[in-house]
Amino acid sequence: MEQQQDRRELDAKAREGETVVPGGTGGKSLDAQERLAEGRSRGGQTRKEQIGSEGYQEMGRKGGLSSAGGPGGERASEEGRPIDESKYRHP
């Protein structure tokens, strides 16, 4: 009974625009946020399987360098940081 009340409270917060589930940003209800979070997690896992663990790590390094000033690959080369794209395993 208490769990249903908790879910109702979380759903009310979600309907007000608050993110109540990590990874559920943009969902307009508790259920929508849960589905978004699950899909995003599954999507990341699928990508990791496609390009391999090392490629996934390199992709994260490259993405971490991206900014409003330009893509991560450009910034990495400007700073002299090597990004080894050969680690990307192509399906």
Curated annotation (Swiss-Prot):
Biased-composition ranges, Gly residues, are 62-73
GO cellular component, alphabetical, reads: cytosol
Q: Name one GO biological process term.
A: response to abscisic acid
Bias regions of kind Basic and acidic residues — which residues?
A: 1-18, 31-51, 75-91
List where this protein forms a coiled coil.
Answer: none
Q: Which domain of life is it from?
A: Eukaryota
Q: Where is this region: Disordered?
A: 1-91
The family note in this entry says: Belongs to the small hydrophilic plant seed protein family.
The protein's name in its UniProt record: Em-like protein
